[in-house]
Structures are given as C-alpha cells and as structure tokens.
Amino acid sequence: LMVVTSNADRICTGITSSNSPHVVKTATQGEVNVTGVIPLTTTPTKSHFANLKGTKTRGKLCPNCLNCTDLDVALGRPKCMGTIPSAKASILHEVKPVTSGCFPIMHDRTKIRQLPNLLRGYENIRLSTRNVINAERAPGGPYIIGTSGSCPNVTNGNGFFATMAWAVPKDNKTATDPLTIEVPYICTKGEDQITVWGFHSDNKNQMVKLYGDSKPQKFTSSANGVTTHYVSQIGGFPNQTEDGGLPQSGRIVVDYMVQKPGKPGTIVYQRGVLLPQKVWCASGRSKVIKGSLPLIGEADCLHEKYGGLNKSKPYYTGEHAKAIGNCPIWVKTPLKLANGTKYRPPAKLLKERGFFGAIAGFLEGGWEGMIAGWHGYTSHGAHGVAVAADLKSTQEAINKITKNLNSLSELEVKNLQRLSGAMDELHNEILELDEKVDDLRADTISSQIELAVLLSNEGIINSEDEHLLALERKLKKMLGPSAVDIGNGCFETKHKCNQTCLDRIAAGTFNAGEFSLPTFDSLNITAASLNDDGLDNHTILLYYSTAASSLAVTLMIAIFIVYMVSRDNVSCSICL
C-alpha cells in the first residue's frame, strides 16, 4: 500500500487591492473603479489681474502720462507724449469705447478705437523723431498748420495731435480736385510703420471760411493692399462735444494705415485733410487680453473672466474665455487620469474542480499588503498567505502613466500654439478673436482632450494584463524546474515558500537550489509493513506473482467457456 502526500506551496502573480476606489472614464469600458487617480482639472475663482510671470506686462500704453487715455497717447495729444515701455503682454484695460480729451472725433466712422489695440499688440513701440512729410508744402498748398484751443499744449497754448497736421489753405481757399501724396516708409529697424491721418469737416459757413468749399470732400488711403474711402459730412453736429471738452461746431475723422518695411502708402484728399506727421514704428508681438488695472503681483496666466491664475492643473472647467500666458486649457467636464490599477476587492481562491478534483488555483480580486507597489506575488501554504510587491513592474506602470501625462501635456501645448497662431493671424486687424469662432474652437479642443484622456485611461487599465504576463514569465524563469505551472499565473512549488522566499522572488534574488535542498519535502512514499515470520521480500514478491498468474489463467478459461456456450458448441447440463 502506498500513501502519497504533498507539502508544496502555491505562488501566484497578483495585483494590489484597495478599499478606497475612485472612478475614471474610459473609451470602451465606460466608468471604471481604480485604486488611484490624478485630477487633471481645476475650477478657478476670480482674482485681480497681475503681471505675467517671466515677462513684462503692459497696463497703460504710457504709464507716466497722467490723465491720458490710451487713445490720447496713440494720437499724440500734446500733454500725453511719453515713452511706451516694451512688453510681451498687454492689458486692454479700457473696456468701454474711450474718446480723446482733445479735438472731438467721429469714432463711429472709422476703426480709430482699434489704434490703441493695434499698438498694444506690438512688443516694441516708438514714435518717430521726424515728420513723415512736409505738410506745409503738400500738394494743394501752401498750408497753415491749424491748432485748437480744445487741444492745449504743455504751455497751455493752442495745439494739435503730434501724429497729424491740420492742413488749412494759406492763400488759395478754393475748391480742388482730388490730390495725391505719397507717404514714405521712414522707420529704420525693419518695423511696421503705423501712419495716422484724417480729415476735418464742419458746417457750411466754417467750410467756406476755412477751405473755400462747402461741398462734401472725398478721401482715400491705400497701404499694404488695403484701400479705404471716405466722404465728409457737412454740418449737423451737436455744439457740445461727446468728449465733454470745449464746444465745437466741427468734427474730425481719424484713421490709420499699416505700412510694411520699405513700402510706401498713398493718400488721396481734398480740403480739410489731416496729413500724417510723426509715425509709430513697432516690432515684435505682445499678446493682448481684456482686463483691469492695477496689476497686483504675478501670475502664470491672465484670464479675461478670472484674472490672474497660477496653473496647478493642465485643464480647467468653468467659464471659457480668452487667456494668455502659461494657462490651463478649458474643458467641458472634470477629467481624471488613472493612477493605479483597476479596483479589486480582497482576493479569494476559487476552488474550481478539475481532473480528479484538483484545485485550479485561479485568483479573484487583489491582494492587500502590497504597500510598496501595485503588482507582485502571493504565496499560499502552511505558513498562510505571504505578499510581496514587485517594484520594477510597478515602476514600469508608473512610467506608462507619466508618458500619458506627457502626451496630454504635448497635446495641450499644440492646442495652445494653435490658438496663439490664430490670434497672430488676426493681429493686423483687431487682435481679438471672434467670440463665436473662439467658442467653437474651444469646444473642438475640449472634445479632443476628453477623448485623449479616455484613451489614456483605457491604455493604463488594459496594460495591467501586460504587466501581469511579464511578471508570470519572470516568475516562471526564476522558479525553473522547482515548480509546476498550474495556469492563471499560479505555480505549485516542490518546496516551501514563506515570506522570506517570496521577498527574494520580488527582489529578483531567488535561488531555487537554496530552498530545494534543506526544505524540499517532495512526495513521500511510505511502504506497508508485513510481519509474517520467515518471509523475506523475495518470497513475498513470489507469492504475489503466483497468485496474480493463477487469477489471470482462471479468468481466461471462464471467458472461453462462456463464449463457446453462446455459440451452442458446448452444452451444459446440471442434474440433481
């Protein structure tokens, strides 16, 4: 009689378990519980505007020009002449249409209110030291350069804007056909040249008195492929100015043209022209955003709705608006990236009956105790359950998550560059994106980012199978012939494997020989003890073989007799 026993242990690969699951969204599995997450979004709160970190931020065009609007500075109002500091970012702080405190301007006729915005969009801005043309000797002259008491100079005498010359005919106060003057490019550093010009109109009496012609006058400017036409309005202006300045019966219309390096512009005019004088020379790019002054402190990002923001997450939810700097990107819903493994309750051994009732050893759930890692090994035996984390596998999983974060960051940068590029394309227009187009673009980018996060979560969760398969191959190689693969990532060892053994497996220092020699307790065969006197082993074997042979012969004879009877070849009679 043989009795077979086993002192083997079972070693399995496994995943950590957690009792605090989080939820992430995936592309195909919907919402999935995981052991940890990295929040990718934040919802900002409103704050004051600030200087943008790492760069110069411009508030007012001329900080030292007191009681001056940015339009005053842009037009060169006599008491508003000063240096405009260079800046990589600018705040459009005058949220309402702002007029000049000088001669009353008909703002609605032109895009003159956009002139300060245009200048804000340049990093470097300077006013030329010389006049672009000699206004007194321009065609249709000679002219007297007009001034106004509503535009006083620094000595409180009559003055006018430094960027324009009010050309009043000196002697020949008569009507004239359209005249043409070329405006040369005079900037010296390859800058854009912003040339300001305009025209004056009044009631009929004043038009005759100043220009000798009471009819509407025609004006045209052309530069850089852009041509603009105007016809002056005669009379009909309220006596009190919209600027709250001195009462004026007349008005001026002011416009500008942008001349590229080396390219001249032209102005076609009649009576009442305001000829260009000093010009703006501008270069570089400064990002513009609507905001408020003063600027307090520093911030990573300037947001039209939230003010100064310090970036803590790559994305934000809440109100979408234009922003500049190192800003999070707007998304519709909060986003989370999986930072761990798929949630599993504490593991149990499922006793599935296989061939001869063997335990299959399939593991369900995760194992508690893998404090230092997400993946690892478990050992089951007389010692109970031992658990050890595999740091290398865990690090590989973390590296994959980091790679996903970097990919999302690259996507963020590309989208920011796309938005920035779109803004630069409109730079020479008004430097403001159309809100509807901007919202549509933001929705599209938000959808792209959300899909990228869903796919990243899908990949992170699905990669668990890869990590476990790699662990299984590693475990099989280390155990070698000292264990039998029983499937589902489990191996039955021919030796004991307690916590020390498992820790060495996790550390990659396991040596099967070290555990097999002293601790091997392989299949034990215990022989039955027969105590008949005078019998040795050879005699016992002889008895066994004789009995077995006799039994075999008897069975063969019995089978032959039954066969012959069934064929009627042999008859059998039983008599009493």
From Swiss-Prot:
HAMAP family, per database record: INFV_HEMA (MF_04072)
UniProt keyword Transmembrane present: yes
Domain of life the protein comes from: Viruses
Name used for this protein in its record: Hemagglutinin
A Gene Ontology BP annotation from the UniProt entry: fusion of virus membrane with host endosome membrane
Protein topology in the membrane: Single-pass type I membrane protein
Maturation and modification: Palmitoylated. In natural infection, inactive HA is matured into HA1 and HA2 outside the cell by one or more trypsin-like, arginine-specific endoprotease secreted by the bronchial epithelial cells. One identified protease that may be involved in this process is secreted in lungs by club cells.
Subunit structure: Homotrimer of disulfide-linked HA1-HA2.
Lipid moiety-binding residues (S-palmitoyl cysteine): 572, 575
Segments on the Extracellular face: 1-544
Annotated positions for site Cleavage: 353-354
The gene coding this protein: HA
Compartment list: Virion membrane; Host apical cell membrane
Organism whose genome encodes this protein: Influenza B virus (strain B/USSR/100/1983)
Cytoplasmic-side positions: 566-576
Further remarks about this protein from its record: Major glycoprotein, comprises over 80% of the envelope proteins present in virus particle.
Transmembrane segments: 545-565
Transport found in the keyword field: no
Family annotation (SUPFAM superfamilies): Influenza hemagglutinin (stalk), Viral protein domain
Record InterPro entries: Capsid_hemagglutn, Hemagglutn_HA1_a/b_dom_sf, Hemagglutn_influenz_A/B, Hemagglutn_influenz_B
Family named by the database record: Belongs to the influenza viruses hemagglutinin family.
Keywords, sorted A to Z: Disulfide bond, Fusion of virus membrane with host endosomal membrane, Fusion of virus membrane with host membrane, Glycoprotein, Hemagglutinin, Host cell membrane, Host membrane, Host-virus interaction, Lipoprotein, Membrane, Palmitate, Transmembrane, Transmembrane helix, Viral attachment to host cell, Viral envelope protein, Viral penetration into host cytoplasm, Virion, Virus endocytosis by host, Virus entry into host cell
Disulphide-bridged cysteine pairs: 12-490, 68-80, 102-151, 497-501
